Amino acid sequence: MKSIRYGVSLIALFALYYLLPLNFRLLWQPDETRYAEISREMLATGDWVVPHFLGLRYFEKPIAGYWINSIGQWLFGHNNFGVRFGSVFAITMTALLVAWLAWRVFRDKKVAVLSPVIFLTAMLVYAIGTYAVLDPMITLWLALAMCSFWGAAQAQSRSGKILGYALLGVACGMGVMTKGFLALAVPVVGVLPWVIARKRWREVLTYGWLAVIVCTLVVLPWGLAIAQREPDFWRYFFWVEHIQRFAEKDAQHKAPFWYYIPFLIAGSLPWLALLPGALKRGWLERDEARGALYLLGWVAMPFLFFSIAKGKLPTYILPCFAPLSILMARYALEAAKTGAKALRINGMINLGVGLLGLIAVLVVSPWGVMHKPVWTKIELYKCLLAAIAFAVWALMGWLAMKNPGRRWSLAALCPLGLALLVGFAIPDRVIDSKQPQFLVDIVSESLQPSRYVLTNNVGIAGGLAWELKRSDIIMFDKQGELKYGLDWPDAQGSFVSQAGFADWLATHRQQGPVSLVLLMDKGESMVDLPLPKPDNAYELGRVVFLQYLPQ
């Protein structure tokens, strides 16, 4: 009965964190609106080979992540839950792999149960795992690679090793088809310390070719299909999205070497106090037969790899949290047995985080010291919801701190208030510029019959296209990440410059209403826009809706 009760509690906790909130949070631009629309177009056109965004060639990523996202919308429909389901599915499968690996490494049921709990409630994992991006998918394939290599290394039979390396090839192949060739580099650097320390080179060289062959066979059908349909894909994807993005001096998202350290620290909440001890114990046990060194290698080596790369984003280190959660779970259970101070300190940290959050809410509220508060006076209920969310965090931290021997696991409940309430507490000023669904809903009666819809922001373009279920959104003045697709001869009608807008409008408005949804710069007003006078206008924060009717 006790195990059944625990099982039901874990399922309920998962539903509260990962299922219930999904449909109640508006989609964020640019990421969620982009991936929502790419998958919608894939379903609408039936083209499962070439990724398109707003009807344009979009070669930022390969195809497999879009497949998973499309299946989510196909199963659950045209809603926010369907858009985000692919990420939740991938991160859930990763958690199950974490549980499997924890059991195979330590043969401890408690470690196997606690590891996915820590993984799913870690802030970085939760934030990305409920957000419609491709990083949860690549994390799934890298976790599968981590598990399959360990399974192959521990197999006692030739058939077991063949199966493990074949599965490794599948994982790497799907990783390549999700995010590119980094899916090959990360497993190599991840296993390197363990292979060197255990002197397993001969086995790797003997069976590694099988993984390479299987990986190639997985990628080959789609790789040849897209090369035939779009011969420029592989050139653009390799040189622009890999070399320029990660290695060159002008790399995209350039950041210093230490960039990921704050994200590792904040991302480990609400289990932060376990981080130093888990890493230290993993290092001290590196010479033991069990897999502490293997797990530590999968944490440290990818972390260093991405730190060395010039282009950086917080989501890149998500795969590090799979092995890290196993090390943290084992350390937490040992600390509970020995009465180590780390569990009390963890409660204190969570209490402090909750209290700091409450103070921050007060500071940025209409009654705070900020000249321009985050929330306005009519958003009192949002301040209250944010305060409740942080109060829950502080309460769970306080309970764990008072009795760390029995209540330390309450840390898993610390982010629950945020998970359930954050979607309702987003300030209006943020919604206006970052969540275009809100504006589209307000002006939908005018937008729906529009013959032409233009916008100067790619993220808003994705939101408009997804909400209106039309891919013919025209970019106005700015091309952004769509420059490559817009440069093709068959895409010339998808962009209108600001200088040529007046002439374009005179030619096209007779065909039907022309609508513009523009994101203005900070401090800019609608009257500052150098545009012809519209027939209808609506301003919402930094976003303005303009409409020109036929004359």
Curated annotation (Swiss-Prot):
It holds the Pfam family PMT. GO terms for biological process: lipid A biosynthetic process; lipopolysaccharide biosynthetic process; protein O-linked glycosylation; response to iron(III) ion. It is a multi-pass membrane protein. It catalyses: 4-amino-4-deoxy-alpha-L-arabinopyranosyl di-trans,octa-cis-undecaprenyl phosphate + lipid IVA = lipid IIA + di-trans,octa-cis-undecaprenyl phosphate. Pathway: Lipopolysaccharide metabolism; 4-amino-4-deoxy-beta-L-arabinose-lipid A biosynthesis. The keyword Glycoprotein does not apply. Its EC number is 2.4.2.43. It is found in: Cell inner membrane. GO terms for cellular component: plasma membrane. One of its GO terms (molecular function) is 4-amino-4-deoxy-L-arabinose transferase activity. InterPro entries: ArnT_tfrase, Glyco_trans_39/83, LipidA_mod_glycosyltrf_83. Keywords: Cell inner membrane, Cell membrane, Glycosyltransferase, Lipid A biosynthesis, Lipid biosynthesis, Lipid metabolism, Lipopolysaccharide biosynthesis, Membrane, Transferase, Transmembrane, Transmembrane helix. Belongs to the glycosyltransferase 83 family. Catalyzes the transfer of the L-Ara4N moiety of the glycolipid undecaprenyl phosphate-alpha-L-Ara4N to lipid A. The modified arabinose is attached to lipid A and is required for resistance to polymyxin and cationic antimicrobial peptides. This is Undecaprenyl phosphate-alpha-4-amino-4-deoxy-L-arabinose arabinosyl transferase. It comes from Klebsiella pneumoniae (strain 342).
